[in-house]
Amino acid sequence: MSKKLISASFILLIAIIFFTTFFSETMAASPCSAANIRWAASSNRVYITGDVECTLTEIKQLGSKYIPLTVSDPANKVWFLGAKLILQNGAKLILHGSPIGGDVDELRLKSNNATSTNNFVIIQADWGGIDIDSTKIVSWDEVASGIDTEYALYKRAYINIRSRLDIDGVTPRESRMDIKNSDIGYLGYNGAEAYGLAWKVSSGSFDTVGVFGDVTNNTIHHNYFGVYTYGAQAMTFLNNEVYDNVKYGLDPHDDSDFLIIDGNYVHNNGSHGIICSQRCDNLIITNNTSSYNGGNGIMLHRNTNDSLVEYNTLYNNADSGIAIFDSHRNTLRNNDAKYNKNGIRLSVGSSNNIVENNNFSENSKYGMYFYKGSDVPTSGDGRIKFNTFRNNIINTNISVAAKIQQADSNIFEGNEFVGNSSYVAEIKDSDSNIFKANTLSGNIKNYYYVKQDAVNTIQDSDFFAVKIGDTISSMTITDSANAVFKNSKNLPTNAYPSYSSIVLDRANAGSSIVGFNRLSFSITPATESLDVKPLTWNTSGDFSKKWTAVSGVSSTTTAAHIIGNLAPSVSYDVIVDGILWNSFIADGSGEISFDYADVFQNIKTFDVRESL
């Protein structure tokens, strides 16, 4: 793990310890009393105020007899709440089921499909707390005598908590909601803080106020959003099943930082399974399964930065397994993204992300997809830059393995592209990308297609092919060990003192697919450069080799040669322009090496043959 991730994890741990300690000390409460319960009949609201903890039984016993709070099924501890319940000034509501000694195994929240006043209720903590454990909570339509499944035409019951600054503008008034071992469903509609389960900090106070809670071992389903946070700090979402929500499954939003999202099964939601959006930093998103969602499996959106996405399984999502949108400095590794539309996509200026050891295979379109998009980035020009894609598997995708557009200065290294149904990479309007030591095999179009307006580099690679699509595009083939390349256009390798290269463009490649093979053969001139063209390179039989070299200058050039693919411990003659120059015995790896000094102004021909 990098120092940066260790640092982020350490900071997160400290934050969790701090906030847990803070709330255990500051939210320790007194017993519930009648003085803390106020019934407002005109607004159909119950207010619980002060430093107290109240259960439904206590509210029923101590509050007004007119509060519409009833036990509809005493034997099964089923309650019905027909009023809005508001927690203020540090008050805490306890909703515990019988498995942990509580009084409510199911809570039904009034949610009638009608336009009349007070047709639905909410539970809200505005500087307070809600503790839900081992129970079930649903909306309830009294007329239908059943769960309220309608969310579009009429409003629907929901639960939310708020944190804010006090009227002095300085003192934080913070709330917390914990949900464990519970079944929460059929809550919320499309309205601010009304999505179903919501944690929110008032806008403008993120730097001094947080909202808190842990969500563990629950089933959360058929809400408008499964979970929504806004300004949350150090929350944990652990081992939940989140499914069949209208929009998102898990949606940490604005400035929700230092969250742990681990071990959740998020599926069949209407849009993205897990989306973290707008300045959500230092997240740990691990070991989740996100599948059959209407959008992306996991999405990092609008400056969701400095986060770790690891060991997630993402399949059968309508868009991409993972999407990075206008987000930066994240590490994505060891994720498995299959059977989606795309394995991964980056857009709107996403930069400086590390994507390594992932599997982006068997997707219905692209394994990897990069594009600027039409959205305005929060900074920069929107092009995809300075990302590293290393040691990923991109196999058997239905279309292009890597679709690259408006992407610059990215590194693709050590990736496996096998059995895809189109190009290895289709590159358009993208410059200064480096493709290094990737494996290309069995793709229907087993080559890099430099389609349009693209100038890039292939570096330190063994076997590959390239097609140039227009006159302003090129691909520079380079090798840091000065290797010579044999290629289907018989183009010379330009050997320099510190590297070798071939610049492939439309002029020398035409419309052909040009195949390249990096030979076990390097030439390193001390000065100047040499154009080296292999003519014969036998790797079996007589192991003979032949090449030409020329500099075009009249001064003497000394060049170090390493020739491989020879039989070990066998003597070989080096013949220059038909004259025996010297003999060498190949070492145990089948190589000979020598320095040769001469004037290479005109073409010189070299032969290596087994000594007679």
Outline where the language-model segments fall.
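C-terminal beta-strand-rich structural cap/linker in extracellular carbohydrate-active enzymes
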Residues: 587-612
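Catalytic cores of secreted or luminal carbohydrate-active enzymes
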Residues: 483-537
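Beta-strand/loop edge motif enriched in small/polar residues
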Residues: 23, 27-315, 321-326, 331-333, ...
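Predominantly extracellular beta-rich ligand-binding scaffolds that present long acidic/polar faces
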Residues: 376-377, 398, 404, 416-429, ...
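Short strand-turn-strand beta-turns centered on an Asx-Gly dipeptide
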Residues: 576-579
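Surface-exposed beta-strand/loop patches in extracellular or lumenal glycoproteins
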Residues: 551-568
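Bacterial N-terminal signal peptides
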Residues: 10-21
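Bacterial N-terminal signal peptides that target proteins for export
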Residues: 1-10
